[in-house]
Amino acid sequence: MNVIVICLDTVRVDKVGAYGPTIVKTPNIDRLASQSCLFTRAYAECPNTIPARTAMVTGTHTFTNRPWQALEAGDLHIAELFAEAGYVTAAFSDTPFNAGANMQRGFQEFIHYPFGKCLRTPDGIELLDTSEAFFPPGFPEKEYLFYPYTRTNRAIAQEEHGKYLPQLMVEDVSGWLQKHRKEQFFLWVDSFAPHETWDTPEPWASMYEPHRGYEGRYIPMPMGPDMSWVMPGDMEHVHALYNGGLTEADYWFGKLFDSIDELELTDDTLLVLVSDHGIPLGEHGTIRKFGYPIYEELAHVVLLMRLPGQIPARSRYEGLVSNVDVPETLLDVAGIRRPEGMQGRSLWPAATGEGLPRAERLYLGAYNYRAGVVTDDGYKFIDNRGEKGDELYNLPSDAAEKQNLIEESPELAAELYRALWDFHEPWRVKLSRHHRDAKK
């Protein structure tokens, strides 16, 4: 049996048709969902690019004890285990931070595209004019360059290859599958789409513009938490740009789904589609991940698993699951022994319908920023570390997280606060011992 993991960046669950009504067109993800087990309550244990991937390749939590950082020498990447088990391993990535974060470990082939979104344009190449774009006041210079880098890199890809980057990557992956279709393989496809900056080509760029007549500012990379710059129509425009980027990603990855079918790999391949996190687009007074607010629009993630004959089509698992569960699931399916130290659990019994006890609580957060806990009956407690006071929501009746119940339910809030910090205890002990040993 083969394993393919497709990780898309910045996919909001509420924008995907398989999860509920939306104006956004995602027919290919929806088609995959109709053949899969859909996990309705999957969360990123830390909704940020590299920490989320660290959780998904090591099976360990990051929000408790480590910031955004590269894999350490002692971290075991799941690809290393598949390689040791005799699998052919490969990864294709246009996510700009992966190569510098040691995400190539265990892969016999690691193809990283040098002209992806937000990657520095090669020296000696003049950046294209981007004066048509609006950047909010106070925009960091480093991030200000992300858009001209992205715009110029896309032009380089088109000039050198005649293709958009998602198209190029999907075609490269399809070619790799053609070459290795007779072998047992573990393949990781890591796409930065539909992450900002939004320099989406037509027909997707204007597909969702309000009334198709927006004449306001072009905002390819908005910024929060200060939203004082927002003018009427701006946020509808920002949503439209994001929606177009998601539909573009859906289009190209639909081609990859087709290739898997055409190469007759479908019946013998576990296909996992997961997003690393979502994105705030003004719902709680902020845009993008600044401060890592762990509201649903950021922390709730897409997770689908397909294996015909073993995973029932159109099935759903309603229990709480985390991206930290992904590697244990893959190892379980492949019959590879789980190493000590993994902190998730296999979701295979949930995917197959055999039955998996529902987790009573799920923990998530962002190291040194905030932490939270979601309960099986739908409550969500957020410890903001004193920044703006704690929050408590009843998600079944308040999915948008607008009615803070912290004053109405102090006993429940206190209980969840204690549970959250009890969950942190092993790491607090570990870190304090490390500090003590370092001072000797």
Residues covered by each model-derived region:
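Catalytic domains that recognize anionic headgroups
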Residues: 1-440
